[in-house]
């Protein structure tokens, strides 16, 4: 019996050693893989959970709430800062706006807006309400705002510059054509160079003092045969008798002047003198005098009559009825579509030039006013941890699922390394 027992013991001891050897080699990699998988899975869950802080005996348990719920506001600020500093920078928004706001797209947008407005106001009731609103606005503008603006303009130095520009651009480019010269010469002949006006002007001119002066000048300056006439006969007597003739016999004098004007061809001479006449043909001093008189006259007229005229105009016109008639014609006219195309085309060019010059300053003002950073912070802070977890898992589902398996592989490798250390580097027994 002792022999049998002795023979069995070595066999049992060898089997036990074999089992220990298998566990010695197999267990560390399995345990390492299990630890890696479990720890990574737990770490991922602890990013979001628990959603709220937990307490034990009145004390907050560490690592509660999870990483994202605890630092949600800090996370929101970082995301908002990255969005405004890296993604939606002023230069990037400027490039996006330039790419989107092309002249063609601006024209299409304006055309769509105009057509939409035209369709909206095809309803008579809406059109009537708009007409009343426009009428009230126009009446207020012409009755109150425009008179004040005209009065302020007439008192400022800007009005002088405006009137000077008007004179340079309008009056400076005027030129009297032949037909205009003919009509102007006829008007001057009928209203200025009339026989009666010439007779009265000559009577007023030939005063006794004027006749004496002319007689004296003729005696002193005449030469040759004219000296003999001036000093022997003299011109004082003939001028005095001619004046008496004009005073005493006005009808005969007027007939005489009529024949004189006809024989002198005054109309033809005036037409020739006025044809082609323009401000540019005048001397610089004359042009400056005309400009000064033009500016002074318009400024005085604007100051004296402008506010009152605008106010009377605003009170005398039924602006609501006028606006209703205009809107009815615009909406019902077949030419409106053509006008819309031209308006959209012209407005798009104007808007494109404005945006080319002012887009960058507008973007710099627009971004702070938009408050993107604060809006992102508010949205993220108002998002519940459950929704945030679901959103991140939806975006990185495969990556989050792969992390525990990566941890398992790393744990398995660490277990193999432990086996290597125990069996080779630091053997046991």
Swiss-Prot record:
Pfam families: DUF445 (PF04286). Keywords: Cell inner membrane, Cell membrane, Membrane, Transmembrane, Transmembrane helix. The chain crosses the membrane at residues 18-38, 406-426. One of its GO terms (cellular component) is plasma membrane. It comes from the Bacteria. It is a multi-pass membrane protein. Disulfide bonds: none annotated. InterPro entries: DUF445, UCP032178. It is found in: Cell inner membrane. Belongs to the UPF0754 family. This is UPF0754 membrane protein glr0504. The lineage of its organism: Bacteria, Bacillati, Cyanobacteriota, Cyanophyceae, Gloeobacterales.
